[in-house]
A protein has these predicted regions:
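Short secondary-structure boundary micro-motifs
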Residues: 17, 27-30, 62-63, 81, ...
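Short, well-structured hydrophobic secondary-structure segments
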Residues: 38-41, 51
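Long, hydrophobic N-terminal alpha-helical segment
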Residues: 1-38
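Short, conserved turn/kink motifs that form compact alpha/beta structural patches or helix kinks used as
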Residues: 57-61
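Vicinal oxygen chelate
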Residues: 1, 3-12, 33, 43-46, 53, 65-91, 115, ...
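Short, charged helix-to-loop "capping" segments that act as catalytic/coupling loops
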Residues: 24-28, 48, 108
Length: 138
C-alpha cells in the first residue's frame, strides 16, 4: 500500500482551493464532483513531487461533517492505494482497525471501489484500488 492522498474538510471548496494554491502552490487537478453517497463535494489538488490533497465540503444533509467544519474543519483522512481492497481490508481488520465502510463504488474515483477504516487515535483511513480520479482537468 502507498499513500494516494490526504484529505481535509473545508467549509467552502472555492476558498479552500484558493488557500492551498496561495499558501502551498497546489493546483486544482479535478473538477468539483458531488458525491451523493458520502454527501460531500470533492476536488483534488496536486503539486509536483508532493502528495495529492483532497478537499471535501459537506452537503447540507451531512450533519456530522457540517459540525466538524463549523468548528474549523481540517484533517479528515489519509488514503492508501492498494492492489486488493478486500485482502487489505481483512489484513488491517486483523491488526485491530475497525471497518467503517465496506468496499463500494467511489464517485470521485470513477466508481472504482473504496473502503473506510478507523484506526487508533481517531485516524480515518480510506482504501482505493485505482489511480483514476473523476473529472481530471489535466
Amino acid at each position: 500500500m502507498i499513500i494516494d492522498h490526504i484529505c481535509f474538510a473545508v467549509r467552502n471548496l472555492t476558498e479552500g482551493i484558493a488557500w492551498w494554491e496561495r499558501v502551498f502552490g497546489y493546483k486544482q487537478m479535478t473538477s468539483v464532483i458531488e458525491n451523493s453517497r458520502q454527501k460531500v463535494k470533492v476536488t483534488f489538488l496536486n503539486k509536483e513531487d508532493s502528495v495529492t490533497v483532497k478537499l471535501i465540503e459537506p452537503l447540507e444533509s451531512n450533519q456530522s461533517l457540517l459540525n466538524f467544519v463549523n468548528k474549523g474543519g481540517g484533517f479528515h483522512h489519509i488514503c492508501f492505494k492498494c492492489d486488493n481492497i478486500e485482502k487489505d481490508l481483512k489484513t488491517l481488520s486483523m491488526k485491530g482497525l475497525l471497518t467503517l465502510v465496506q468496499p463500494q463504488p467511489g464517485e470521485a474515483f470513477n466508481n472504482h471501489n473504496i473502503a473506510f477504516l478507523l484506526a487508533k487515535y481517531g485516524l480515518n483511513i480510506e482504501l482505493i484500488d485505482t489511480d483514476e480520479k473523476a473529472g481530471m482537468l489535466f
